[in-house]
């Protein structure tokens, strides 16, 4: 380890001890060192012994900084790894940190643009509008049009900080995986790999810009969701420029009600937006926490969601969507056998899994949930319980479904915060049934045929040549087969002839031996000579 890594490790250990997180460590030889450090570093005391363990964990991650805050946020979605009281606290982590110097932000923007900021913008506000662990946001106006915009800039020198902490995380995960057998099923190294990929992706604002443009295209002209326009010609890897929007934060219930917002419709539209993204577009905003969602105040009776920060998105293929739709429909029809069989057929649990045992395990977990009124059932928790049960049957983690489950929990939470009587099933069921109807039956066949029509239209002029070539090749193949068959028949005839001559020759040789013992020498000689002749003829027939 380098001196800087040792220093950072000491800082992490100090924070861990100050918040009493050594209580989280299992009783194992590897974990005795941190526990002994509690005695060795006697001057470091547990500052909050009266606080619950989950709260102490959250506060410790906040103190350790952006890498650990985001790691805690990601881990809050992995309820298969953490008990509820810890996962609930991790979900409260807020990605809000002190802003860095505005002049430094301006210098970083000018470095990305390749010239003074005044060449492109006016009214630049050096005081940030918002600040997070990875980036900071300032306001300005476009010089040519006077249009209000926001500039999102990556924090300078954030990458080395992230890479250093990630290296330490890898070291810790490798040690845990190597020395604690019961932790191996949690795959700590894979968890860190997944986290590193997510975090590094957020450092490239071109990716976020691309995601925002895609989501904006998908909802162009929609009354349900608005995504701010990205000004692409002045955006780059470390700078993203987009239009400025004015809205009410979705968690500000008091202001929404004061504005006369139709809360029921707003809540239902949140669910509708989510399922539209999933089943129509196969592309969904996967970070829809309250800080990234606003409400357009202009038409409160017909409220529109506004989605920001598209750094994290999820994509689903046809199989993923079928899995989600059929499982949810199976649940609400209490067809747990179908749910179990779907997992086996998809290959997500081993083919040798006992379907009856799997069905029974799902039924035990889900029956209490579906005993509630439909309006009280949480889709997100249904999926969570399903994933946890399936993992006991060796289901591999599906990252895209974990993202989807996290987003669904966000959407449900927001929806019921806005309108507690929200019936998600009533809103979601039409999406599921419509999508399934499009996948099965005559309509699905005609749709598939229509989709393939341009391809076949392009290939149609080649069809006569293809038919001619196929017929010609078929004729040549038939001729070859006839020759092969004729050769085969000739070979079989030769084999039969050779076998006959061999048998006759063997019989004559045996007769010659008998005649010789009876002193009939002349006849024995003739029989032997004839037998040898037949053998020679059989050998020739076999050639």
Curated annotation (Swiss-Prot):
The keyword Aminoacyl-tRNA synthetase is assigned to this record: no
Active site residues according to the UniProt entry: 287
Keyword line: ATP-binding, Cell inner membrane, Cell membrane, Kinase, Membrane, Nucleotide-binding, Transferase, Transmembrane, Transmembrane helix, Ubiquinone biosynthesis
Binding site for ATP: 129-137, 152
Homology family: Belongs to the ABC1 family. UbiB subfamily.
Underlying gene: ubiB
Compartments where located: Cell inner membrane
Source species taxonomy: Bacteria, Pseudomonadati, Pseudomonadota, Gammaproteobacteria, Vibrionales
The protein, known as: Probable protein kinase UbiB
Catalytic class of the enzyme: transferase
Record keyword Cell membrane present: yes
GO MF assignments: ATP binding; protein kinase activity
Bilayer topology term: Single-pass membrane protein
Bilayer-crossing regions: 517-539
């Amino acid at each position: 380890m380098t001196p800087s890594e040792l220093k950072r490790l000491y800082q992490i250990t100090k924070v861990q001890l100050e918040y009493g997180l050594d209580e989280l460590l299992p009783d194992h030889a590897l974990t005795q060192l941190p526990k002994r450090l509690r005695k060795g570093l006697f001057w470091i005391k547990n500052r909050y012994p009266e606080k619950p363990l989950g709260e102490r964990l959250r506060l410790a991650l906040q103190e350790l900084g952006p890498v650990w805050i985001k790691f805690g946020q990601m881990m809050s979605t992995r309820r298969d790894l953490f008990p509820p009281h810890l996962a609930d606290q991790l979900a409260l982590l807020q990605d809000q940190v002190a802003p860095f110097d505005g002049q430094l932000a301006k210098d970083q923007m000018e470095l990305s643009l390749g010239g003074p900021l005044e060449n492109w913008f006016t009214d630049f506000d050096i005081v940030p509008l918002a600040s997070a662990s990875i980036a900071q946001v300032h306001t300005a106006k476009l010089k040519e049009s006077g249009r209000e915009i926001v500039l999102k800039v990556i924090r300078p020198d954030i990458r080395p900080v992230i890479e250093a902490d990630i290296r330490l995380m890898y070291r810790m995960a490798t040690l845990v995986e190597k020395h604690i057998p019961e932790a191996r099923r949690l795959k700590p190294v894979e968890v860190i790999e997944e986290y590193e990929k997510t975090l590094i992706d957020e450092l490239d604002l071109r990716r976020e810009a691309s995601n925002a443009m895609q989501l904006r295209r998908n909802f162009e002209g929609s009354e349900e969701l608005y995504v701010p326009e990205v000004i692409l010609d002045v955006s780059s890897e470390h700078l993203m420029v987009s239009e400025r929007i004015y809205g009410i934060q979705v968690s500000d219930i008091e202001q929404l009600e004061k504005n006369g917002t139709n809360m029921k419709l707003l809540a239902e539209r949140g669910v509708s937006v989510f399922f539209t993204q999933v089943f129509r577009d196969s592309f969904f905003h996967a970070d829809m926490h309250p800080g990234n969602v606003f409400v357009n105040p202009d038409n409160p009776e017909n409220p529109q969601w506004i989605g920001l920060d598209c750094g994290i998105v999820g994509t689903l293929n046809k199989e993923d969507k079928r899995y989600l739709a059929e499982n949810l429909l199976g649940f609400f029809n209490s067809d747990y056998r179908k749910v179990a069989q779907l997992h086996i057929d998809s290959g997500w649990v081993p083919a040798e899994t006992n379907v009856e045992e799997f069905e029974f395990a799902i039924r035990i977990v889900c029956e209490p949930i579906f005993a509630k009124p439909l309006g009280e059932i949480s889709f997100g928790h249904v999926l969570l319980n399903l994933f946890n049960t399936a993992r006991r049957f060796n289901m591999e983690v599906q990252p895209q479904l974990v993202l989807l489950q996290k987003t669904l929990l966000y959407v449900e939470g927001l929806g019921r915060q806005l309108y507690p009587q929200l019936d998600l099933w009533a809103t979601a069921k039409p999406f599921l049934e419509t999508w399934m109807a499009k996948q099965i039956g005559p309509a699905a066949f005609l749709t598939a045929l229509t989709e393939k029509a341009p391809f076949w239209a392009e290939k149609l002029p080649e069809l006569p040549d293809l038919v001619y070539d196929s017929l010609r090749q078929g004729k040549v193949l038939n001729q070859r087969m006839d020759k092969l068959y004729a050769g085969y028949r000739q070979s079989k005839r030769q084999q039969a002839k050779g076998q006959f001559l061999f048998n006759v020759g063997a019989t004559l040789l045996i007769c010659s031996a008998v005649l010789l013992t009876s002193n009939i020498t002349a006849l024995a000689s003739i029989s032997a000579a004839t037998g040898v002749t037949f053998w020679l003829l059989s050998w020739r027939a076999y050639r």
